[in-house]
Amino acid sequence: MSWPGAMGKRLKSCKLLFFFYPADFTFVCPTELEDLENHYDAFQKLGCEIYSVSCDTEFVHKAWHDHSERIAKITYPMVADPTHALARDFEVLIESAGLAERGTFIINPEGKIVAYEVNAGNVGRNADELLRKVQACQFVHAHGDEVCPAKWQPGAETLKPSLDLVGAL
């Protein structure tokens, strides 16, 4: 993935979490965005920047920020995508509705998507689990010969894939 100009230089220096959500002034979305804000410092300590993205305009973002106590707390960037360019590029655009699906993308400093998921519109995401996924992606990036099993947490045992492990787990 390539990013233009100064934005590209900034984005290549860290890990990224793109967090697409359907729309401002809705129901599940503010609970997710508040949960992310409550964990934002932990993401920052990992060198991971969060970008929440909806197909709303910056004016709608501003109105929501001014209207909602939950959204007023947010300090990470809220990206407006009224042309649907990002949602289309990440293949989460619901063309018929002009909305983004509830998609999450973890991108490493090389610009490679290393984890992604798309939830149903009525199912919220968990910032604790997203943080764990970022930590796992960072671990395997730094330790190329190891993998993180289910429910892995930092400091827990990892696996080294080999023929000896085939059928042993």
Across the structure, where does each feature detected by a protein language model lie?
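Chalcogenol-based redox active-site neighborhoods
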Residues: 1-169
